[in-house]
């Protein structure tokens, strides 16, 4: 059930909860949060209706609208991709998307939770002229980094680094937006895809990221991949590259 709205500032937005997505016009009367290690709370709407939300801390790795993904048909905006579409992957050639999902992030939530704000990776900031165009991603979205230090520190030609762990390096910073949509897509395995000319990850289901999708989207994933309901199934969905911890990423990028 949806009820159309315009949030403060006159910009349309949607608020997603784990079970419900509501789009409405008018301001929010109040926002309340419970700090219990995740972000939980309640939104009181002008109409008097209340909406619960939870696990906003678990913002999953996502692209934002306008990001161009390399496909056999050329670059396509990520928001146009659907299940069954083929995408160019670094390791396994053309692969069909198994599932696509998204999370709406209204300005009210971003203002109350600044750590959820998208991160801008400026063109060229990953080295070797990559990405080719500015790229806006969620804080947990991981990108491929390949340089002399990946060999020196980790004996790896390429590693995955979360965008939030790149903060402080030249050309990477949080941005203030009125609202945004985080879009994610998944394959039969964790893949590396070309986005705005840079190699970045597809969605990888794990205990953390599965909390970040709503109940209905999580059900869709389990219908496609029933093995992911078990810990051993999640463990078998391996990461495409070594993923650096925050301290490892900082060590690699320090002057």
Summary of predicted features, one role per range:
Residues 1-61:
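Acidic, glycine-rich low-complexity segments
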Residues 79-86:
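Structural motif
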Residues 55-58, 80, 99, 184:
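Extracellular/lumenal ectodomain signal focusing on beta-strand-rich modules
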Residues 98, 205-255:
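Non-catalytic peripheral regions of nucleotide-handling enzymes
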């Amino acid at each position: 059930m949806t009820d159309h709205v315009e949030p403060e500032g006159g910009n349309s937005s949607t608020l997603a909860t784990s079970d419900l997505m509501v789009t409405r016009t008018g301001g929010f009367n109040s926002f309340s949060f419970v700090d219990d290690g995740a972000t939980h709370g309640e939104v009181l709407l002008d109409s008097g209706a209340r909406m619960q939300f939870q696990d906003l801390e678990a913002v999953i790795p996502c692209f934002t609208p306008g990001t161009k993904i390399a496909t056999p048909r050329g670059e396509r905006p990520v928001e146009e991709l659907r299940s069954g579409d083929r995408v160019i992957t670094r390791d396994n050639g053309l692969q069909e998307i198994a599932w696509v999902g998204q999370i709406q992030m209204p300005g009210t939530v971003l203002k109350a939770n600044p750590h959820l704000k998208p991160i801008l990776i400026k063109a060229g900031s990953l080295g070797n002229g990559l990405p080719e165009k500015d790229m806006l991603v969620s804080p947990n979205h991981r990108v491929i980094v390949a340089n002399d230090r990946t060999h020196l520190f980790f004996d790896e030609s390429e590693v995955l680094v979360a965008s939030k762990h790149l903060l402080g390096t030249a050309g990477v910073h949080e941005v203030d937006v009125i609202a945004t949509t985080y879009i994610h897509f998944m394959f039969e395995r964790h893949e590396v895809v070309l986005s705005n000319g840079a190699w970045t990850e597809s969605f990888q289901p794990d205990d953390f990221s599965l909390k970040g999708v709503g109940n209905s989207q999580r059900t869709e994933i389990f219908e496609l991949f029933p093995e992911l309901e078990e810990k051993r199934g999640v463990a078998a969905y391996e990461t495409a590259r070594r993923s650096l911890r925050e301290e490892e990423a900082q060590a690699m990028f320090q002057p």
